[in-house]
Amino acid sequence: MNSPNESDGMPGREPSLEILPRTPLHSIPVAVEVKPVLPGAMPSSMGGGGGGSPSPVELRGALAGPMDPALREQQLQQELLVLKQQQQLQKQLLFAEFQKQHDHLTRQHEVQLQKHLKQQQEMLAAKRQQELEQQRQREQQRQEELEKQRLEQQLLILRNKEKSKESAIASTEVKLRLQEFLLSKSKEPTPGSLNHSLPQHPKCWGAHHASLDQSSPPQSGPPGTPPSYKLPLLGPYDSRDDFPLRKTASEPNLKVRSRLKQKVAERRSSPLLRRKDGTVISTFKKRAVEITGTGPGVSSVCNSAPGSGPSSPNSSHSAIAENGFTGSVPNIPTEMLPQHRALPLDSSPNQFSLYTSPSLPNISLGLQATVTVTNSHLTASPKLSTQQEAERQALQSLRQGGTLTGKFMSTSSIPGCLLGVTLEGDTSPHGHASLLQHVLLLEQARQQSTLIAVPLHGQSPLVTGERVATSMRTVGKLPRHRPLSRTQSSPLPQSPQALQQLVMQQQHQQFLEKQKQQQMQLGKILTKTGELPRQPTTHPEETEEELTEQQEALLGEGALTMPREGSTESESTQEDLEEEEDEEEEDEDCIQVKDEEGESGPDEGPDLEESSAGYKKLFTDAQQLQPLQVYQAPLSLATVPHQALGRTQSSPAAPGSMKSPPDQPTKHLFTTGVVYDTFMLKHQCMCGNTHVHPEHAGRIQSIWSRLQETGLLSKCERIRGRKATLDEIQTVHSEYHTLLYGTSPLNRQKLDSKKLLGPISQKMYAMLPCGGIGVDSDTVWNEMHSSSAVRMAVGCLVELAFKVAAGELKNGFAIIRPPGHHAEESTAMGFCFFNSVAITAKLLQQKLNVGKVLIVDWDIHHGNGTQQAFYDDPSVLYISLHRYDNGNFFPGSGAPEEVGGGPGMGYNVNVAWTGGVDPPIGDVEYLTAFRTVVMPIAHEFSPDVVLVSAGFDAVEGHLSPLGGYSVTARCFGHLTRQLMTLAGGRVVLALEGGHDLTAICDASEACVSALLSVELQPLDEAVLQQKPSINAVATLEKVIEIQSKHWSCVQRFATGLGCSLQEAQAGETEEAETVSAMALLSVGAEQAQAVATQEHSPRPAEEPMEQEPTL
């Protein structure tokens, strides 16, 4: 019995728990064993061995006496309770451990799963990349195979081609002819060898062909060089340039062409410098230099720099001056004079080193379109003794080759650039032009024979025209040369008079260039008042501060002008303009000139190429804006021919340096004008998220699309917008504010530096939560585009309002953004930077002398900026209908008591709705306000122009922070119709607020329909029968009470504010009938009183009677 007692004295209870299951519950030892476990069995002070001594006594006492069954039952219950608690605790520990292990395993499984998925994705990506690479390789192989097959097919076609077709591979016939050509070069003809027939001469092979690409072997010199200018054998080919001997006419190797032209351009130098071989310029050449000028700019009408290469076409003059060749007069047959034949072969090889390949266009050599003649009509003339015989032979050859439509003229005073006569009977559009040029030069040389006594060298640039008279030559030996195309040159003048004429032309051309610069500056001012209907463009317009953007606009956007659909005016479309430009490019921009008999032919254009080159350059910009119209220009022999082109001046920005018909301003149809420009779309937050910003570019895009879809836009006149100038903006805003928001980093440097000192150079913007910048949390700013966009919005409205006020348009609707009626003199707020409506009203008064302007602002927010601009101005009446709520709605201004100040007292009317949106203000309230306040005051004011700040955020669909009212879009159409009864219908609406796209599109459609006098949908019957809300009636009563002191017309509407529209209309009708009846009664009473007065008046004693007229 001691062991159980000792166990009871131990602090742990595990032994007793283990014994319980083995011992029957009804046995006495169980009671003995469990008793110490009970909470109240032993005092807590007992412990250790000291507490064990009295236990046997108690146990023996318990065993001695009978145990109470109730107490034993209670003990058992307590034991069971403790047992359950122990088991529950063990379960909790076990569950906690299980949950811990489960979470650990779950995390391990997730990590393993993620790792596995990552590996799978990497494998898939690698596999996809491999597949793409294989696909790319297969595609590349397929392309290579196709290219190889194409080349093989081309080679096969070339091998099997007919001999008459072109080929880049030299055929046997070409090689044989080249060999014959080289052999003929080794045998120089003697001066007396005049018996060469034309078909046998190596230079006459071109006569068998009719195009540039079919011209045969090259000559030793440039095409058409006379025999006296023949080069030493292989002279050019032994030079340092190492030019290839020949290329076939159809050679497609563009790289070789570019390399050859590059070498030629590198070797070209000023025509006035000494030759590299040290050859002294002849006396005649020095005289030519004195006549033509001292600079390279005189060498070409196009003012091309010498040696500018293939990208800068030079005239024939510059070609000869640079190269020493006479390429402009290729068909003058001359003999080799003794002094020229004595030239050593090695004396000046570099003088003729400019190789001219028949396959290259060689812009600086020869006429634009001289073609060869069929080799059947020109025969050799073995004997030629006098100059007259040479001229006779020339005329005979012309008669054989073709008939002249005009008589042969003496051309001593005609510059070569004006020669052009139509040849009949020639299949080529430029046939026999070279022969005609030759005959005219013969006649000219005969009259200028005093200049031929000077010893001449082969490289003299002016030798050709004067040597003709003294050389013994034959027309039958005229050398043939290949025709040149895509050239910008003209024949070289062959007389001092012609050279002086050329100098005059170039001086006049420089004068025209200066005039062009002046016209561009003048065009900036004229464009502001010019009228050119167009489709909206995406480019900045002309402003004083952005000259670079102006030029880009002229080149990039001016061509986007579109005629208004349904317009009765005849305006060329963009397709027509492109067709005209294509035709001009095909004709080489030649001017068509009528001859004396009134007949024009295709040969006249090339002869005027030099004079037209300057015009083409002059009208490059304007050509994209306006259609070209060619006028007849007389062939004037005494004046400079600079009066050939005239343009339809549909825009004042076109260059006006030439005499042309007077400008006719574009006449707009008397209808509704609409202005819109896509440049305003660039004003957006830099974050690019339009969902965060209610005022975004989609607003005006949606309205423009809606007007297009409904067909309303086609009935309107589309007006071309522009940017407002800084001076125009400063009519309302301060200079600091204007420079702050009206300039961008691009044009800010052009302004006066003194204006940028101070806060502007250190301007700071607020960082928005979206990542962009802005003036406040709503008014975003884009440093690069916002300044131009806000100025474009102002300028568009100004242009439209000016046209309406001037009577050119009936009315107008401006689809512009950002809005402006919150912008004050020096403050930007509420999405607004510049107050477009206020600026427009100021400019109307200042520039068009408009007397009185009415501004109606039905945006749900008060136009605090507009009110501030005209608060003391009696010439501008400002009426605003807005949500006020006792100053608790943005911007908090616009109380009914704000009626103006100073001389403008009473010219500020605020219909300030109060009471919140319970119930919301709707159609009935707005129509009642117009009936009782707006229209009576407006009629009494009698404005000259009505401007409307057309904000549509009161339309149903806008939430309470940005609106909350329930006005329908149809209602705004009826309000617009009422305003059209003012100012003779001169009403201009400018978009302000409104951010629900559907709502603003519906409202804009309704307003444009009203402006176009399209029948509007009638108001619902419920609206006509509904009475205004109590809050609205209270607001209107307060407004009438305040404004009746300044406008007596509103006093009579104070009693009928609570009536419905039907009741009000019935009352007005009855009142009108009563007034009419009273007026009739008063008129009748006056008439009766007048009759009675007349009856009672005494009759004169002697009233003369009418006498009969004497017969």
UniProtKB/Swiss-Prot annotation:
Gene3D superfamilies (UniProt xref): 6.10.250.1550, Histone deacetylase domain
The keyword Isomerase is assigned to this record: no
Low complexity: bias regions: 485-495
Keywords noted in UniProt: Acetylation, Chromatin regulator, Cytoplasm, Hydrolase, Isopeptide bond, Metal-binding, Nucleus, Phosphoprotein, Repressor, Transcription, Transcription regulation, Ubl conjugation, Zinc
Primary subcellular site in the record, as a coarse category: nucleus
Region of interest: Histone deacetylase: 671-1017
SUPFAM superfamilies: Arginase/deacetylase (SSF52768)
GO cellular component: cytoplasm; nucleus
InterPro entries to which the protein is assigned, alphabetical: HDAC4/5/7/9 (IPR046949), His_deacetylse (IPR000286), His_deacetylse_dom (IPR023801), His_deacetylse_dom_sf (IPR037138), Hist_deacetylase_Gln_rich_N (IPR024643), Ureohydrolase_dom_sf (IPR023696)
Catalytic residues of the enzyme: 822
Reported modifications of this chain: Phosphorylated by AMPK, CaMK1, SIK1 and PRKD1 at Ser-250 and Ser-489. The phosphorylation is required for the export to the cytoplasm and inhibition. Phosphorylated by the PKC kinases PKN1 and PKN2, impairing nuclear import. Phosphorylated by GRK5, leading to nuclear export of HDAC5 and allowing MEF2-mediated transcription.
Compositionally skewed regions (Acidic residues) per UniProt: 572-610
Residues the entry annotates as binding Zn(2+): 685, 687, 693, 770
The protein's enzyme class: hydrolase
Residue numbers carrying Phosphoserine: 250, 489, 600, 650, 1097
Region Disordered, annotated ranges: 40-63, 107-136, 187-272, 474-495, 527-611, 645-666, 1086-1111
Subcellular locations according to the entry: Nucleus; Cytoplasm
GO molecular function annotation: histone deacetylase activity, hydrolytic mechanism; metal ion binding
Catalytic activity: N(6)-acetyl-L-lysyl-[histone] + H2O = L-lysyl-[histone] + acetate
Annotated function: Responsible for the deacetylation of lysine residues on the N-terminal part of the core histones (H2A, H2B, H3 and H4). Histone deacetylation gives a tag for epigenetic repression and plays an important role in transcriptional regulation, cell cycle progression and developmental events. Histone deacetylases act via the formation of large multiprotein complexes. Involved in muscle maturation by repressing transcription of myocyte enhancer MEF2C. During muscle differentiation, it shuttles into the cytoplasm, allowing the expression of myocyte enhancer factors.
Description of how the protein assembles with itself and partners: Interacts with AHRR, BAHD1, BCOR, HDAC7, HDAC9, CTBP1, MEF2C, NCOR2, NRIP1, PHB2 and a 14-3-3 chaperone protein. Interacts with BCL6, DDIT3/CHOP, GRK5, KDM5B and MYOCD. Interacts with EP300 in the presence of TFAP2C. Interacts with ANKRA2. Interacts with CUL7 (as part of the 3M complex); negatively regulated by ANKRA2. Interacts with ZBTB7B; the interaction allows the recruitment of HDAC4 on CD8 loci for deacetylation and possible inhibition of CD8 genes expression. Interacts with RARA.
Domain comment quoted from the record: The nuclear export sequence mediates the shuttling between the nucleus and the cytoplasm.
Family that this chain belongs to: Belongs to the histone deacetylase family. HD type 2 subfamily.
Protein name as it appears in the record: Histone deacetylase 5
Lineage of producing organism: Eukaryota, Metazoa, Chordata, Craniata, Vertebrata
Gene coding for it: HDAC5
